[in-house]
Amino acid sequence: MGKIENNERVILNVGGTRHETYRSTLKTLPGTRLALLASSEPPGDCLTTAGDKLQPSPPPLSPPPRAPPLSPGPGGCFEGGAGNCSSRGGRASDHPGGGREFFFDRHPGVFAYVLNYYRTGKLHCPADVCGPLFEEELAFWGIDETDVEPCCWMTYRQHRDAEEALDIFETPDLIGGDPGDDEDLAAKRLGIEDAAGLGGPDGKSGRWRRLQPRMWALFEDPYSSRAARFIAFASLFFILVSITTFCLETHEAFNIVKNKTEPVINGTSVVLQYEIETDPALTYVEGVCVVWFTFEFLVRIVFSPNKLEFIKNLLNIIDFVAILPFYLEVGLSGLSSKAAKDVLGFLRVVRFVRILRIFKLTRHFVGLRVLGHTLRASTNEFLLLIIFLALGVLIFATMIYYAERVGAQPNDPSASEHTQFKNIPIGFWWAVVTMTTLGYGDMYPQTWSGMLVGALCALAGVLTIAMPVPVIVNNFGMYYSLAMAKQKLPRKRKKHIPPAPQASSPTFCKTELNMACNSTQSDTCLGKDNRLLEHNRSVLSGDDSTGSEPPLSPPERLPIRRSSTRDKNRRGETCFLLTTGDYTCASDGGIRKGYEKSRSLNNIAGLAGNALRLSPVTSPYNSPCPLRRSRSPIPSIL
């Protein structure tokens, strides 16, 4: 092999788009995939070209030595030889123009930005590419996401905010066509952990496990079935009737005044006592509503998959507190003792808790949930708004107090006859009303200096409130659009995964068809480890018939859909190093948060955790410098 020249041109064919650059350019970012590719000598078993048709190079005179089995290194990584082309993630060939051409089956548009990062040292995020795709490409090329320029960081981070919002508004997603799978996934989504054991050996236990998720979804998820929609409409009806009854109880037309005066013998005076009672019709209506709420509450707590979480839920606490006073009031109404009357008076005051039932509508209306999440996500903006208002109120209340004292009479030192602003705390109320542009008119300045302060206060209030409000509105728009998109998300189905080619097939391991041999991401040929590839296909398709391999548990078969779920379910993922140099791999395989494993068939080598065998035809490459890019290891997309 000849000495590598830094000014030698290299042609990178990425997804059919050819990019031409120098080896010195690729070496500007040590530790990345392209830097390792540029630092190594051309392997001997790569394909050469004759015209436009790729042909295998002549076989070596002696068979290459077999490399020992790969052993897991730190963090679950595999270290071993990296002499052949496929282990480097690309397919190389001699180009007639004199340069080396390497083929990578990756996204060509994103690679243009990656290559510009090598040229200019600045990594920008394309605006027309989805964030997870760009993140996946950065992970493949071994580039740290923190290298993204500040001008593009917000654009790059938008997909994670969207994923978090989609997690909040998660709706039922059915991933298969089998009704049994639908029930299992629904049970898993509703909190039933043992979704795979719905039909246990005990008949009674099996019936309970089948009934529990259905009843829970019936009262908790209005979109699970038609019966659930009917229950939701009934609950909505009783909530509105209960709130209407609560409001009508305060109207004079539904109040009955009764004389409760008790005659006293030998008394010198008579004290009249009157008591207001509610119309019995409203009491009966409220009783019917309470019976429904009691039935709903008991059913939900009995069939709840997690009793502790159910009890700690704020809406459930409100529901219980709104139900309990009615039964206590009915039980104590027949008692005439003073203690019972005091308790009844307290319970009548607690009746206002019934108005909080309006928050139960958040279960049935997406808009109310959007509003709640918007308020929660805009906490910083609300805090900033309160600070601005507090500063303005303090400043203008002080200014109006001293401005209105101008022109006070000498015989009126407190200026109580001259102005309504007798002290600064009273000015707080005026400043709040003025800054919020309400203007009740109960207090107003009367001097020219006070009018000037009032005008400045109104202008400052308009500017102060106008600054944080657009951020809150944008949050609401983002949450609402994502919630609507989540609801309209089509029914998911299992992806079609073609079967593995047989050894007798004419297309088995042909280089012209770009099979697993000499592919971009594959480290082994189908003929070398067909059993491993068959197992990987069965893992991706959810098939349990993988020979001697143990079946996967139901949580492992559930699709990875969200960034938070991917972080929780990550268990020592593997990555494959390109050289035998001392390289540090993170425990999570170097895959960053929010990065989902690729579903490509060319990326599944080693998914089962079996030992891979690489057969280099050249001596392993020894890097001149230690490759320790701990923040950005070079993972295979696994």
Curated annotation (Swiss-Prot):
K(+) binds at T437, L438, G439, Y440. Glycans are attached at N259, N266. Coiled coil: none annotated. Changing F219S: Found in a patient with generalized epilepsy; likely pathogenic; loss of voltage-gated potassium channel activity; no current is detected when mutant channels are expressed in Xenopus laevis oocytes. Signal peptide: none annotated. The chain crosses the membrane at residues 230-250, 284-303, 314-334, 346-368, 382-402, 453-473. Zn(2+) binds at H124, C130, C151, C152. It is found in: Cell membrane; Membrane; Perikaryon; Cell projection, Axon. It catalyses: K(+)(in) = K(+)(out). Gene3D superfamilies: 1.10.287.70, Potassium Channel Kv1.1, Chain A, Voltage-gated potassium channels. Chain C. Inhibited by Stichodactyla helianthus peptide ShK. Inhibited by millimolar levels of tetraethylammonium (TEA). Contrary to other channels, inhibited only by millimolar levels of 4-aminopyridine (4-AP). Residues 1-229, 304-313, 369-381, 474-638 are cytoplasmic. Changing T437A: In DEE103; affects voltage-gated potassium channel activity; when expressed in Xenopus laevis oocytes, it results in a shift in voltage dependence of activation to more hyperpolarized potentials and a slower deactivation time. The keyword Amino-acid biosynthesis does not apply. It comes from the Eukaryota. InterPro entries: BTB/POZ_dom, Ion_trans_dom, K_chnl_volt-dep_Kv, K_chnl_volt-dep_Kv3, SKP1/BTB/POZ_sf, T1-type_BTB, VG_K_chnl, Volt_channel_dom_sf. Keywords: Cell membrane, Cell projection, Chromosomal rearrangement, Disease variant, Epilepsy, Glycoprotein, Intellectual disability, Ion channel, Ion transport, Membrane, Metal-binding, Phosphoprotein, Postsynaptic cell membrane, Potassium, Potassium channel, Potassium transport, Synapse, Synaptosome, Transmembrane, Transmembrane helix, Transport, Voltage-gated channel, Zinc. GO terms for molecular function: delayed rectifier potassium channel activity; metal ion binding; transmembrane transporter binding; voltage-gated monoatomic ion channel activity involved in regulation of presynaptic membrane potential; voltage-gated potassium channel activity. Homotetramer and heterotetramer with other channel-forming alpha subunits, such as KCNC1. Interacts with KCNC1. Homotetramer or heterotetramer channel activity is regulated by association with modulating ancillary subunits such as KCNE1, KCNE2 and KCNE3, creating a functionally diverse range of channel complexes. Interacts with KCNE1, KCNE2 and KCNE3. It is linked to A chromosomal aberration involving KCNC2 has been found in a mother and her two children with varying degrees of neurodevelopmental delay and cerebellar ataxia. One child also exhibits episodes of unresponsiveness suggestive of absence seizures and facial dysmorphism. Deletion at 12q21.1 deletes exons 3-5 of KCNC2. Developmental and epileptic encephalopathy 103: A form of epileptic encephalopathy, a heterogeneous group of early-onset epilepsies characterized by refractory seizures, neurodevelopmental impairment, and poor prognosis. Development is normal prior to seizure onset, after which cognitive and motor delays become apparent. DEE103 is an autosomal dominant form characterized by onset of various types of seizures in the first year of life. Belongs to the potassium channel family. C (Shaw) (TC 1.A.1.2) subfamily. Kv3.2/KCNC2 sub-subfamily. This is Voltage-gated potassium channel KCNC2. It comes from Homo sapiens (Human).
